[in-house]
């Protein structure tokens, strides 16, 4: 789960969509 968070940050947190 922690590794997934790092991947999202590298792509620019597209899942969040917020940023």
UniProtKB/Swiss-Prot annotation:
Q: Which Gene Ontology cellular-component terms appear in the entry?
A: ribonucleoprotein complex; ribosome
Which of UniProt's keywords are assigned here? Ribonucleoprotein, Ribosomal protein
* Superkingdom classification of source: Bacteria
Under the subunit heading, UniProt states: Part of the 50S ribosomal subunit.
Family (UniProt) = Belongs to the universal ribosomal protein uL30 family.
Q: What is this protein called?
A: Large ribosomal subunit protein uL30
Which source organism?
Answer: Brevundimonas vesicularis (Pseudomonas vesicularis)
């Amino acid at each position: 789960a922690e590794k997934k968070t790092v991947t999202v940050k590298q792509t620019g947190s597209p899942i969040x969509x917020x940023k």
